[in-house]
Amino acid sequence: GIEREVTVLKTGQEPYNWQVEDFEKPKEEDLIIYEVLIRDFDYERTFQNLIDRIDYFKDLNINAIELMPVMEYEGNESWGYNTAFHMSVDKFYGPEEKLKEFIDLCHQNGIAVIFDLVMNHVMGRSPMNRMWMNDPDGNGWGEPSEESPYFNEIATHSYGLGNDFNHQSSYTQYYTQ
């Protein structure tokens, strides 16, 4: 038979115990942002490594860190713009709890965390694509069908990749709000 991925949603998880619940983000005009691609930050490539380097970030006198995409993407060597699962942290960087710990530590040190999110498209492994796709070969891969409430059958522009979100759709608007 054909092997396919399955999407699993974890429910009933223990909530993270945030140490800082009243962080106030800097005003936009006051932002001093340091952009981080975790994959290239250093050889460790993990959230834990960012946690361990908080003094480095503080010494830069920044007040915000922008994380290039950290959501689950296809493959392991990527900038993350080939997102497959928006609701999952990529396995390459470590567990979700470590990301939350990093955010909390940044907030304890007056540093905001900004996520670079990819909401223009999604790659073929996404269950949002697979639920409404044309699969002419029956191999689990295909393009969005006209029944898809989320995607354009054909991208409405020439500069995209993956499956193009239909941002006019109320489903997409709800999903991306």
Map each language-model feature to its residues.
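Alpha-glucan (starch/glycogen) binding determinants
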Residues: 1-11
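Substrate-binding/active-site clefts of carbohydrate-active enzymes
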Residues: 14-15, 19-31, 37-177
